[in-house]
């Protein structure tokens, strides 16, 4: 009976009190967490912090990058608890204002009861994240390729139509002199025909 008390009942009570203790500690921390002061300090050190924060963000896992872009809700922070805890530790290393006390509090109470403070830090980190250039949509790329192909085909057709026209022009030029020769021969034959009738009356 004693062993059952120690292993089940006492352990359950300890967990209950421990959980309540963490909540109480988190509540006390949130009361003393001065957002205005931390926000002002971040603004003052913005130029100094930017390259350090960018480096930390770039080396962070995808879930943190997604969390920085989306709304920092308590459920999302809880879902990504281990990654958030690690990220806060990295921010504390570069002396990001507010990160160190929040990181220490998370180590004692967990991420869930401290989600308001964590969300505040993440919101302050978000503006430092470099914006990604929008990638062109696949449909737009396909349309551009189709258009370029159609233009190329049309140009090829025009070249093919223009090519036969040149030999035809050359043939016409070659035929022109022969036509002139025929006309000259006809003109020479006409005087001969006219002279023949004139000679006939002399014979009579």
Curated annotation (Swiss-Prot):
It comes from the Eukaryota. InterPro entries: DREPP. Induction: Up-regulated under salt stress. Residues 128-204 are annotated as: Disordered. Residues 147-161, 182-192 have a biased composition (Basic and acidic residues). Belongs to the DREPP family. This is Salt stress root protein RS1. It comes from Oryza sativa subsp. indica.
């Amino acid at each position: 009976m004693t062993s059952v008390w120690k292993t089940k009942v006492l352990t359950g009570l300890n967990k209950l009190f421990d959980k309540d203790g963490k909540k109480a500690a988190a509540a006390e921390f949130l009361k003393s967490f001065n957002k205005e002061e931390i926000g002002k300090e971040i603004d003052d050190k913005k130029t100094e912090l930017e390259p350090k924060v960018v480096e930390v963000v770039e080396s962070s896992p995808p879930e943190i990058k997604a969390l920085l872009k989306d709304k920092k809700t308590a459920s999302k922070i809880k879902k990504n608890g281990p990654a958030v805890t690690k990220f806060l530790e990295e921010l504390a290393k570069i002396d990001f204002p507010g990160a160190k006390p929040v990181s220490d509090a998370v180590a004692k109470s967990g991420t869930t009861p401290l989600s308001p403070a964590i969300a505040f830090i993440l919101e302050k980190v978000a503006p430092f994240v470099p914006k990604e250039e929008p990638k062109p949509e696949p449909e737009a790329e396909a349309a551009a390729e189709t258009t370029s192909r159609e233009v190329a085909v049309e140009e090829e057709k025009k070249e093919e139509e223009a090519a036969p026209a040149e030999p035809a022009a050359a043939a016409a030029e070659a035929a022109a002199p022969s036509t002139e020769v025929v006309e000259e021969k006809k003109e020479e034959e006409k005087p001969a025909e006219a002279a023949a009738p004139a000679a006939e009356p002399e014979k009579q």
